């Protein structure tokens, strides 16, 4: 895909970004490089290659889904300045 200076200016205008001529030229060079890289990646033959979600083919060891800590809400709320119905009461900060 080829990109022109007018394309850069048009996108900047649509995004309501003020862009100088120098910045437009620099962005043109950078974006053209990105598009060239994308074209190179699209040209790679991937037929017969199995898609993968991770670079290392290994199984992650997971722990059992069991409760390991007890409920300490009563202990924590015993030192709170104010609580009501199990909730912490805090000063109002937004009017």
Curated annotation (Swiss-Prot):
Its EC number is 6.3.5.-. One of its GO terms (biological process) is translation. InterPro entries: Asp/Glu-ADT_sf_sub_c, GatC. The gene is gatC. Coiled coil: none annotated. It comes from the Bacteria. GO terms for molecular function: asparaginyl-tRNA synthase (glutamine-hydrolyzing) activity; ATP binding; glutaminyl-tRNA synthase (glutamine-hydrolyzing) activity. The keyword Protein biosynthesis applies. Heterotrimer of A, B and C subunits. Keywords: ATP-binding, Ligase, Nucleotide-binding, Protein biosynthesis. It catalyses: L-glutamyl-tRNA(Gln) + L-glutamine + ATP + H2O = L-glutaminyl-tRNA(Gln) + L-glutamate + ADP + phosphate + H(+); L-aspartyl-tRNA(Asn) + L-glutamine + ATP + H2O = L-asparaginyl-tRNA(Asn) + L-glutamate + ADP + phosphate + 2 H(+). This is Aspartyl/glutamyl-tRNA(Asn/Gln) amidotransferase subunit C. Transmembrane segments: none annotated. The lineage of its organism: Bacteria, Pseudomonadati, Pseudomonadota, Betaproteobacteria, Nitrosomonadales. Allows the formation of correctly charged Asn-tRNA(Asn) or Gln-tRNA(Gln) through the transamidation of misacylated Asp-tRNA(Asn) or Glu-tRNA(Gln) in organisms which lack either or both of asparaginyl-tRNA or glutaminyl-tRNA synthetases. The reaction takes place in the presence of glutamine and ATP through an activated phospho-Asp-tRNA(Asn) or phospho-Glu-tRNA(Gln). It is an enzyme of class 6 (ligase). Belongs to the GatC family.
């Amino acid at each position: 895909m080829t990109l022109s200076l007018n394309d850069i200016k048009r996108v900047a205008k649509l995004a309501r970004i003020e862009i100088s001529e120098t910045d437009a030229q620099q962005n043109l060079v950078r974006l053209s490089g990105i598009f060239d890289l994308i074209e190179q990646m699209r040209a790679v033959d991937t037929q017969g290659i199995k898609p993968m979600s991770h670079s290392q083919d290994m199984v992650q060891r997971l722990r059992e889904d069991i409760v390991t800590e007890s409920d300490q809400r009563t202990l924590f709320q015993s030192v709170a300045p104010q609580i009501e119905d199990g909730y912490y009461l805090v000063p109002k900060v937004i009017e």
